[in-house]
């Protein structure tokens, strides 16, 4: 039960900054004995005045450990809702270890991962979505993720879900009336009208789930495979995009026998996972064929495919192999002609969408295309919709959506079944809102947080 409400009356401490030598470190101390413990290790009386900064020396008997600044927060006006002190000390690891050893000696316990945020949740300073937003904000990799984290932290997304949950809860009441008083025709008519609103709820939830899945996809990185026949310049293109010598480049066909991966960030926002694949051709070489099979599997898992063609061989490139596979699989792909510097500018290259020279780093048109196409994956319609980034949130929203679909796909089912589906949807949304406590879920969420957070 939330780690037995986290041994509620323990006073905890942890380093809130990264554990490296630096100019300044911050050690957090929180709990009912925070001021009593800090007074045991300081050279002067630390008064219980909130929102004040006080200078003091940390001492061990008569030995001065450090000269520090103490930021004081008195319950309930603190992040955790408890008495809290943030010790701003000098940034040597020896110093922070000495201070934390003193805190431990005088009764404070080293905090578990996410324990400060968990106490904030238990003391109703934040809800689960806001707690998760703190974690997402720390690990945000792009503007989209950062913006979603800030909005979630403000409680904006929780309000959206609360509105949907209240609509479903109201429907539960109407269905229960219809079950208890089947003779009232007016109630039946009202219920029929209200079920039309359920369609709007489904559409709203579907948009939220779709946008959340897309943001998760973008945050993890859009997968782009570079495919083509041997010696088309795939490895040279990967190296040019990464601006480093990641893949081996030779004139010998079939040099790349396994996938080679690298990551770039476009516009400080779009994470692109690039995958260079083995050249695809008919081959009797058993080892090369393994690489070719892997290339096709990489295509299957990719969000976008760069089909690279050597412009020297454009007139004879084989449409029956790679091209046909991409069409059959309905993959989004772009035809890119490489080695533009080696061919006659008047060469008819009708199907080629972009021309580059990977060897000469002339790839600006391709980069522009990748930026535009990757952004298009995240459709920015309905910007006001909430976006959730964690798997547990998305899973619960999908469960609610699934149960709403069960009702709308069979509008003539018994009211008892309708009630069951509505309750499942309602409970899922209550879990998102942290109003229906699933203690195992709560422990799992905070377990993934940083120490000191």
Swiss-Prot record:
An annotated Gene Ontology molecular function: GTP binding
Pfam family, one: MMR_HSR1
Binding site for GTP: 231-236, 250-256, 276-279
Enzyme Commission no: 3.6.-.-
Binding sites annotated in the UniProt record for Mg(2+): 235, 256
TrmE-type G domain: residues covered: 221-375
Keyword Hydrolase: yes
Compartments, record wording: Cytoplasm
GO cellular component terms attached to this protein's record: cytosol
Binding positions ((6S)-5-formyl-5,6,7,8-tetrahydrofolate): 28, 86, 125, 453
Binding note for cofactor: Binds 1 potassium ion per subunit.
PROSITE patterns assigned to the protein according to its UniProt record, in alphabetical order: G_TRME
Keywords: Cytoplasm, GTP-binding, Hydrolase, Magnesium, Metal-binding, Nucleotide-binding, Potassium, tRNA processing
Residues reported to bind K(+): 231, 250, 252, 255
Gene3D superfamilies (alphabetical): P-loop containing nucleotide triphosphate hydrolases, Probable tRNA modification gtpase trme, domain 1, tRNA modification GTPase MnmE domain 2
Summary of the function given for this chain in its UniProt record: Exhibits a very high intrinsic GTPase hydrolysis rate. Involved in the addition of a carboxymethylaminomethyl (cmnm) group at the wobble position (U34) of certain tRNAs, forming tRNA-cmnm(5)s(2)U34.
Family note: Belongs to the TRAFAC class TrmE-Era-EngA-EngB-Septin-like GTPase superfamily. TrmE GTPase family.
Subunit structure: Homodimer. Heterotetramer of two MnmE and two MnmG subunits.
Name of the protein: tRNA modification GTPase MnmE
Organism: Mycoplasmoides gallisepticum (strain R(low / passage 15 / clone 2)) (Mycoplasma gallisepticum)
Lineage: Bacteria, Bacillati, Mycoplasmatota, Mycoplasmoidales, Mycoplasmoidaceae
Gene from which this protein is expressed: mnmE
